[in-house]
Amino acid sequence: YRAITDRIALKRAENDNLVNTTDMIFFKMFLEEKPDATISFTDVVQLMGGGTPKTEEESFWNGDVLFFTPKDVSHSPFCISTEKHLTTDGLNNCSSRLYPPFTTFVTCRGTVGNLSMAGVSMAMNQSCYALKGKNDFPPLFIYSFTRYVIATMKKKASGAVFSALVTRDFEMEKVFEPNFGNAILFQKRVEPPFSQILANTNEIQQLSKLQNALLSRLSSR
């Protein structure tokens, strides 16, 4: 049991280091020369919504479709499992689409301004936005770009807690104009660390399941 706990801690620390690496690459490529904020965040990023099907309709729930909510934000940049699941009928009867892997989610109610990236395809509830690059800006760039922009927004709020994020907040947020070629190059550079983070996140999930199984076995002795 101790060995599993240590392995999980090791993988989490490795992920933290890899995220720091991607942050440093982003800083070097886009922020080092202190570019002026001349355009709106929504000139670069498209905001998309989610929705929840009727909770009392049993045929909509407990299927195979992952359903992201703010509760599913974890220590990892990637979300690979969710507390709730929809059926195909449930997905077809709510205002969320099925978002592809590497879609960035940002929480806009409850705990506001948390980020997660879909590790697999999943739907999403109405307490979040799903973000996609306009004009083919690639997904890993969008994640890191949004991470930087949200951190800037939080700094500007100078410690004040966001109560909610609405579309207008993103429309009003001025950002630097990213060079498309650099964004593509950034995507290529950070694909290896993000792939490793995703692999580690999958391993952590498997280890946690094993840990829980061991715990229940120990407690039933």
Model-derived regions, located:
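A general structural signal for short secondary-structure junctions and capping/turn motifs
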Residues: 33-34, 57-60, 95-98, 121
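Short connector loops/turns at beta-strand edges and beta->alpha or beta->beta junctions
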Residues: 73-75
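Short beta-alpha junctions and helix-cap segments that line functional grooves
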Residues: 54-56, 117-118
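Cytochrome P450 core scaffold surrounding the K-helix E-X-X-R motif
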Residues: 77-82
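Non-catalytic DNA-recognition/assembly elements of restriction-modification systems
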Residues: 2-52, 62, 67, 71, ...
